[in-house]
């Protein structure tokens, strides 16, 4: 149990780091890369990290879907992007290389 909790805590920090990097980079077309990278890094921590990544990713997407109803009037315009985000999340969590989503020109520091 302690190792699971430690993995979950470190995985949470991996997700926070990816989010902060995404905000700092502010690079068009890079969001899927940062989604995949955060999930990939967290899942590498072990089952606790993978669990934390899924909980955080699902909560973020559910919150975004909720707020999109007010932003887009329930038009569903955000639904396609949310599905693409979830696919990138799962890609990373499953251990696949997040660089698959890396846009050309994104600075090497990320």
Curated annotation (Swiss-Prot):
Major acute phase reactant. Apolipoprotein of the HDL complex. The gene is SAA1. The keyword Nucleotide-binding does not apply. One of its GO terms (biological process) is acute-phase response. It comes from the Eukaryota. Induction: Upon cytokine stimulation. Keywords: Acute phase, Amyloid, HDL. Residues 93-110 have a biased composition (Basic and acidic residues). Residues 73-110 are annotated as: Disordered. Belongs to the SAA family. This is Serum amyloid A protein. InterPro entries: Serum_amyloid_A, Synovial_Prolif_Regulator.
